[in-house]
Amino acid sequence: KENGISDCNCDRYFSQPDCDIGWDSSRDCFYHGYDLYMLIDSQSDLPVFPHYSCASTHDSHGFLQAFFRMRSFLPDYKVSKVLLDSAHDAMPYYQYFKRQNITPFIDLNSKAGRPPVYKNDFTIDKDGVPVCPAGHRMRRDGIEAAKGRMKFKCPKISHAGGCISCTCDNPCSNAKYGRTVHLVLNDNPRLFNNPPRSSKEWKQEYNARTSVERSNK
């Protein structure tokens, strides 16, 4: 190009032939090189296993390469929880972690979709909380571990003055405590988590994912 030749067919020497092109979403540009996937211990903020791959490797694939290589190099290292961003929000991840008795804390990818209807007339909100036919987010009412399901109840039930009453303008049930729905975890392990994404427990645990940024610094 320095000599005005834009289409040069001269032989070239590539010192790093396995480099390729990747997309940096934070900088909104392409780059040439490698991608570093670092597995971090969220309690100590210390790196556990670094793994380099081609720049074109998607984060979801980078995790698989790093995770299974880590397990081969560190077979005694115990993993009980994983904290991952929405790039890893795919059903096979949840199914694998369940088989391995690992609790996943994975942010939902809004582009991955949700079932339009659950149990005939409920919809599922963006964080996995059921929404009643009247459009109200249901209130969590515990988990039945033996049955593998979470219980959500009507949020419009009032106990004011020691009396139980429904404050909804269009109640969808005549039951004393209003409408109840059970989310069966096996129905959709991606959407239905224990603890659920709407809970303080989930958010507190997921906040520890910032250990990645602290480790990189």
Predicted region positions:
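Contiguous terminal or domain-adjacent regions
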Residues: 106, 128-132, 161-167
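Alpha-helix-centered segments that form part of catalytic cores
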Residues: 11-35, 171, 184-189, 193, ...
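Long, low-complexity, polar/charged, intrinsically disordered or flexibly structured peripheral segments
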Residues: 22, 153-194
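A short glycine-/small-residue-rich loop at the edge of a beta-strand within enzyme catalytic domains
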Residues: 54-58, 81-84, 88, 123-126, ...
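Short gly/pro/ser/thr-enriched loop/turn and capping motifs at secondary-structure boundaries
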Residues: 111-116
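Short, intrinsically disordered/low-complexity patches at protein termini
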Residues: 71-73, 117-118, 129, 156
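Polybasic low-complexity intrinsically disordered regions
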Residues: 1-99, 105-109
